[in-house]
Swiss-Prot record:
<protein>
    <recommendedName>
        <fullName>Granzyme D</fullName>
        <ecNumber>3.4.21.-</ecNumber>
    </recommendedName>
</protein>
<keyword id="KW-0325">Glycoprotein</keyword>
<feature type="glycosylation site" description="N-linked (GlcNAc...) asparagine">
    <location>
        <position position="83"/>
    </location>
</feature>
<feature type="glycosylation site" description="N-linked (GlcNAc...) asparagine">
    <location>
        <position position="68"/>
    </location>
</feature>
<dbReference type="Pfam" id="PF00089">
    <property type="entry name" value="Trypsin"/>
</dbReference>
<dbReference type="InterPro" id="IPR009003">
    <property type="entry name" value="Peptidase_S1_PA"/>
</dbReference>
<feature type="active site" description="Charge relay system">
    <location>
        <position position="208"/>
    </location>
</feature>
<keyword id="KW-0458">Lysosome</keyword>
<feature type="active site" description="Charge relay system">
    <location>
        <position position="113"/>
    </location>
</feature>
<keyword id="KW-0720">Serine protease</keyword>
<dbReference type="InterPro" id="IPR001314">
    <property type="entry name" value="Peptidase_S1A"/>
</dbReference>
<feature type="glycosylation site" description="N-linked (GlcNAc...) asparagine">
    <location>
        <position position="106"/>
    </location>
</feature>
<feature type="disulfide bond">
    <location>
        <begin position="179"/>
        <end position="193"/>
    </location>
</feature>
<dbReference type="InterPro" id="IPR018114">
    <property type="entry name" value="TRYPSIN_HIS"/>
</dbReference>
<feature type="propeptide">
    <location>
        <begin position="19"/>
        <end position="20"/>
    </location>
</feature>
<feature type="signal peptide">
    <location>
        <begin position="1"/>
        <end position="18"/>
    </location>
</feature>
<dbReference type="InterPro" id="IPR001254">
    <property type="entry name" value="Trypsin_dom"/>
</dbReference>
């Protein structure tokens, strides 16, 4: 997709159902080289855009709800971006050859909200484009651990447009039992709860699929936050889906 089309979509309000960063700060340009800007467009021109992250030169992980429900839709991934509204020399725009939502994905409760994207061509590794490591199968995060999530989301609750520049916020891993009280369908087996109960800091609109980074590894990807309660968000637990990710990458 030509860069100008991406610029035009960012002039539009965020689509309901996407998620964005609330709070946080603008990161040093290209200091998060794994970040991907994911766009899904159907035949009528309806767009969904999300975050995602490069895990191999030709594979990106994002949220399953970032896929347009229309059968006739296309997806593109932009890598190496900092200011998504600018035509940066570092950017690599690559069409998606195949999207693979998890077969157990439930759009109502965001269960198994994870999707693997196979790119049409391999990304060229540069200082602005590099994969993010996945954790080992026995790796865990615990309550109190501090992680981060980045994206091009809004800077405030009332802002309906995406941020031009990549922003990041630090989040604290929360107790599972506390999150079960606030999120009816929260499942600790497949999800991680992170945020800050005392501050308004969380992903919320326009940044679904962005990685929860702990110790330079992707432990989660952003799935959803509770309307009216944005002190924390729910992330799909990457460790739980490692066998599924590995299997599909070998098949393609």
């Amino acid at each position: 997709m030509p860069p100008i089309l991406i610029l035009l979509t960012l002039l539009l309000p965020l689509r309901a159902g996407a998620e964005e960063i609330i709070g946080g700060h603008v990161v040093k340009p290209h200091s998060r080289p794994y970040m991907a800007f994911v766009m899904s467009v159907d035949i009528k021109g309806n767009r969904i855009y999300c975050g995602g992250f490069l895990i191999q030169d030709d594979f990106v992980l994002t949220a399953a709800h970032c896929k347009n429900s229309s059968v006739q839709s296309s997806m593109t991934v932009t890598l190496g971006a900092h200011n998504i509204t600018a035509k940066e020399e570092t950017q690599q725009i690559i069409p998606v050859a195949k999207d693979i939502p998890h077969p157990d994905y439930n759009a109502t409760i965001f269960y198994s909200d994870i999707m693997l994207l196979k790119l049409e061509s391999k990304a060229k590794r540069t200082k602005a484009v590099r994969p993010l490591k996945l954790p080992r199968s026995n790796a865990r995060v615990k309550p109190g651990d501090v992680c981060s999530v980045a994206g091009w989301g809004s800077r405030s609750i009332n802002d309906t447009k995406a941020s031009a520049r990549l922003r990041e916020v630090q989040l604290v891993i929360q107790e599972d039992e506390e999150c079960k009280k606030r999120f009816r369908y929260y499942t600790e087996t497949t999800e991680i709860c992170a945020g800050d109960l005392k501050k308004i800091k969380t992903p919320f609109k326009g940044d679904s699929g962005g990685p929860l980074v702990c110790d330079n590894q992707a432990y989660g990807l952003f799935a959803y936050a509770k309307n009216g309660t944005i002190s924390s968000g729910i992330f799909t637990k990457v460790v739980h889906f490692l066998p599924w990710i590995s299997w599909n990458m070998k098949l393609l």
